[in-house]
Amino acid sequence: MDLLLLEKALLGLFAAAVVAIAVSKLRGKRFKLPPGPLGFPVFGNWLQVGDDLNQRKLANLSKKFGDVYLLRMGQRNLVVVSSPEMAKEVLHTQGVEFGSRTRNVVFDIFTGKGQDMVFTVYSEHWRKMRRIMTVPFFTNKVVQQQRFNWEDEAARVVEDVKKDPQAATTGIVLRRRLQLLMYNNMYRIMFDRRFESVDDPLFNKLKALNGERSRLAQSFEYNYGDFIPILRPFLRGYLKLVKEVKERRLKLFKDYFVEERKKLTSTKSMTEENFKCAIDHVLDAQQKGEINEDNVLYIVENINVAAIETTLWSIEWGIAELVNHPDIQKKLRAEIDRVLGPDHQITEPDTHKLPYLQAVIKETLRLRMAIPLLVPHMNLNDAKLAGYDIPAESKILVNAWWLANNPAHWKDPQVFRPERFLEEESGVEANGNDFRYIPFGVGRRSCPGIILALPILGITIGRMVQNFELLPPPGQSKIDTSEKGGQFSLFILNHSTIVLKPRSSV
């Protein structure tokens, strides 16, 4: 470690401590802040709560400090919202005031300081990007056009699994094949392209770079430099790696996909009537001067981050729960057989005729929420919430997982029981009609990908159950469903081997 750098950092910490104490006293007199644990100068509550602010830890803190509480993470304010009423206030009633996104050193690099749509602040730029992305990605028309591709990809998974002799005996790690399915689902929407197999070199290069991006962005390793800016020089090596990964990914998106699509369409007279894929619409917006080339690449980046992995996690969670709950799996299979018969494979329209399948998907999203704290919100200006003052640029976390797993609001929430959505919770939908259950968020900054995720989940999980008996490996009664979280994600720690026995009647 550079001794001069260390000396400067220590002096900076001392100065920051003095300033923090003074500011804290002034702020306490000026603001009525939400309750929270007493913190230390400079570090705030960071030393007490640690880096991993997972949904369970935050839920436990809410039992002590209430539905709205404040954590000081170094020099950053973090406000945690833990009730349906306060979630409605943040996401709906005051959706404009709390409609921005927080910034940090790593996401600033990966998004070009907010040139994307998902992670940018609430502004005219966000409205423009949302509008440009909606037509080619997030409409019912897209679902009806693309459902045949999703059904085709699910059929290919079934075919590949049946060809693998290990699948029905010792088992396979199904996630690898499902990952290809999700990439193909989204790349067919974006570029009218697909990857032929899990061994495709371009697919593996893309998957590796996206995986590295995910690891770097979701890691807690860089928190100290984000919470305490004076320590940021110690992040130089980390941020250098982030920049390298960002540049390699954007170059890959540009060279292998965007430019290839441009070449393909350059010989044709392109009008909206003959646009074949989403990037055609996006490039048209660029040609009209609405966005620039960087914006185009960050749209591709957003889809890779926000659509592929999150839906994959939910598919994996759903299948894992069905493996570990054979009675539920049998009940779902019986519904499919009864409604569709033996010779008809599930299609997107069929999923709406299968209420138990819909309940299984809802229950998966409730118990195993892929983004349990939603994507963090931020208020650009000073705001009020529940009678408390919320200082400008506070990071707002809505603990959506706790809203959907609080025993005060749900019967036996720790139990995987799809029947709840056919019985006492039959009126609850994933679109946010009940603030106890908001897996995709609500309001202006809700996830528009819900319109794609729900049918893909229904088709994929439905086809797996329709064609196979899903079992744990020989000698095991269940598969491991231990959780692993990142900055705001929740996925399975170990990608388990499962046995898939083909059904003789299908």
UniProtKB/Swiss-Prot annotation:
Primary localisation category: membrane
Chain residues that bind (E)-cinnamate: R213, S214, R215, L216, A217, Q218, A306
GO molecular function, one term: iron ion binding
The reaction(s) this protein catalyses: (E)-cinnamate + reduced [NADPH--hemoprotein reductase] + O2 = (E)-4-coumarate + oxidized [NADPH--hemoprotein reductase] + H2O + H(+)
Topology with respect to the bilayer: Single-pass membrane protein
GO cellular component, as recorded: membrane
Pathway: Phenylpropanoid metabolism; trans-4-coumarate biosynthesis; trans-4-coumarate from trans-cinnamate: step 1/1
GO biological process: lignin metabolic process
Cofactors required: heme
Subcellular location: Membrane
Domain of life: Eukaryota
Positions with a binding annotation for heme: C447
Entry's transmembrane regions: 3-23
Pfam families found in the cross-reference section: p450
Protein EC: 1.14.14.91
Role according to the record: Catalyzes the first oxidative step of the phenylpropanoid pathway in higher plants by transforming trans-cinnamate into p-coumarate. The compounds formed by this pathway are essential components for lignification, pollination, and defense against ultraviolet light, predators and pathogens.
Record protein name field: Trans-cinnamate 4-monooxygenase
Organism for this UniProt entry: Ruta graveolens
